[in-house]
Each structure stands twice: as structure tokens, then as C-alpha cells.
């Protein structure tokens, strides 16, 4: 029978709160991806490292309610609340997708008190690339 390896120190670390809470981020980029089924809001620093994120699904909305403007507004508010506490004052906004939550998420970002340097639509548009899926017959 092998001998157990002795543990040095305790199993729990002495850290209280999250590891990323210590960073001060004065400027960031807010990415909003609004599809017809869900809205995902990701906040990164200027180098592209994710600081905070939220989606309509993680906010408790299920099924078709995830694609609603109110769900997008709630997701944007949740993602931004944490970075405002970390000291973010200025942000750029990149909006992608055709979903219903585009305007609602942008409205929630504007109301958060962040100074927006610009808002850019980065929805990918094909230059006659792949063939689209066939139309639904209901």
C-alpha cells in the first residue's frame, strides 16, 4: 500500500471574491451579439481579454423569451454592472446580428453612465458567399 502524500497548507486559498476584480479598467469594448434566439453581451478590455459577459439565457430567460428586447436589456445591464464597479468610464460598442435585442441593449448601455466613444455595426455581410438555407414552408 502506498503512503499518502502529505498536504502542505490548507486546501482553500485565502482569496476573497473573484480573481479578476482587482484589475482597474478605464476603457473597454462592449460586444453585443443579437441573434433572433438570444442576445450575448461581452465586455473586454482594449486588448480583447474578456472582463465580463452575460446573455439572456444566463439571466433566467428560457425559450423564445431569450430573443426579446427586455431580455437583451437585462443581459446588457448585468454585464455592465460588474465593469462599472471595476472603474470603467469609457467604452466602444460593437453590435453584431439582426436580432430584436440590438436597440434595447444599446439603450441599456447608454443608461449605464458609461461614456461611449463610438457605436459600430459589425454585422457580417456576405459578398455573395455561401448559399443561404432554403426558405421555410409553414
Curated annotation (Swiss-Prot):
Its main location: plastid. Keywords: Chloroplast, Plastid, Ribonucleoprotein, Ribosomal protein, RNA-binding, rRNA-binding. This is Small ribosomal subunit protein uS11c. Pfam families: Ribosomal_S11. GO terms for biological process: translation. Part of the 30S ribosomal subunit. InterPro entries: Ribosomal_uS11, Ribosomal_uS11_bac-type, Ribosomal_uS11_CS, Ribosomal_uS11_sf. One of its GO terms (cellular component) is ribosome. Coiled coil: none annotated. One of its GO terms (molecular function) is structural constituent of ribosome. Belongs to the universal ribosomal protein uS11 family. The keyword Plastid applies. Residues 1-22 are annotated as: Disordered. It comes from the Eukaryota. It is found in: Plastid, Chloroplast. Residues 9-22 have a biased composition (Basic residues).
